[in-house]
Amino acid sequence: MANLKDKIEAEYENIDRLILKLPEKEKLPFLEFLQLAGVATILHNFYNGVENILKLILIEENIPLPVGSSWHKDLLKLAEEKGIITKITREQVGEYLSFRHYFSHAYALDLYAERLEPLVENLKEVYSRFRKDISNFLDE
């Protein structure tokens, strides 16, 4: 379990460093195209970090990871079912999964500050809730 906690902590450190790079929500409408693309990349990476942590825990618990075309969404459902995260965390993190999917399949030209604003605004709260859920699960 110590090795798992070290791996999770490394993911947290990466996420923490990303969050420090995010501009305030109010500044988003004034960002240049490449800056908006950078913000979108940070949001995408945040979700990837969350997913990495969930996969680490499921593997440690010997729970098979979902497969198939909807495995990302199924991973969140499985994490909730196994008590790793709460329903509200699954729903909130799911917003970042939806954005990750959009970002991965859209042209950067289709990025708009209005779409990023709620994700930037809520990121710290969602991340805090996620960390609390993970801590509660690991401490059981």
Predicted regions and their residues:
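Solvent-exposed interaction patches of small proteins and small membrane subunits
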Residues: 1-140
